Amino acid sequence: MVKQHSYNRDELLLSGHGRLFGPGNPQLPSPNMLMFDRITRINEDGGQYGKGEVVAELDVHPELWFFRCHFAGDPVMPGCLGLDALWQMVGFYLGWIGGHGAGRALGCGEVKFTGQILPDNRLVTYNVALKRVINRRLVMGIADGSVAVDGETIYEATDLKVGLFQNTGELNGA
């Protein structure tokens, strides 16, 4: 597979069906849980740590599913969905560099919310800077991330961890 440095919505949807990195390899969630419309930049040597970065965007419009249920009369994008987008991006990165297995979020350090995403906003920009990538028997990415809406940073998360697993049953003690 030739590495691209950006991906459109249709290409991301292929990932959700296991057709971008191949069967048994990392895949993004399908809609509605896919939390971005495109990846505008992905590389192995960018970001603040020089170990890789991913930048993705979500177009905001009032019809997005979460505005109908969170909250009635006070619509706001749940902060956990922005955090999940950052984990999705770390998992995508691990597949992009050739990691094998199913991706799972493993945790994070600190999370700080200083703003919100509302139906009248226009654009969410997610940024992930890889701090460490382990690509041996264990495949794991550790990154810092941020979420901006209409150019203003509103969430920050440190030490986002995603691992790739050959047998996800191991996570439940099976």
From Swiss-Prot:
SUPFAM superfamilies per the UniProt record, alphabetical: Thioesterase/thiol ester dehydrase-isomerase
Any one biological process term the GO annotation gives: unsaturated fatty acid biosynthetic process
The protein's role, per its UniProt record: Necessary for the introduction of cis unsaturation into fatty acids. Catalyzes the dehydration of (3R)-3-hydroxydecanoyl-ACP to E-(2)-decenoyl-ACP and then its isomerization to Z-(3)-decenoyl-ACP. Can catalyze the dehydratase reaction for beta-hydroxyacyl-ACPs with saturated chain lengths up to 16:0, being most active on intermediate chain length.
Signal peptide: none
Molecular-function GO term, any one: (3R)-hydroxyacyl-[acyl-carrier-protein] dehydratase activity
Gene name, Swiss-Prot/TrEMBL: fabA
Enzyme Commission no: 4.2.1.59, 5.3.3.14
Compartmental location: Cytoplasm
Catalytic activity, reaction form: a (3R)-hydroxyacyl-[ACP] = a (2E)-enoyl-[ACP] + H2O; (3R)-hydroxydecanoyl-[ACP] = (2E)-decenoyl-[ACP] + H2O; (2E)-decenoyl-[ACP] = (3Z)-decenoyl-[ACP]
Active site feature: H70
Residues passing through the membrane, by range: none
Main localization category: cytoplasm
Name of this protein: 3-hydroxydecanoyl-[acyl-carrier-protein] dehydratase
This protein's pathway: Lipid metabolism; fatty acid biosynthesis
CDD domains per record: FabA
HAMAP family tied to this protein: FabA
GO annotation, cellular component aspect: cytoplasm
Subunit structure: Homodimer.
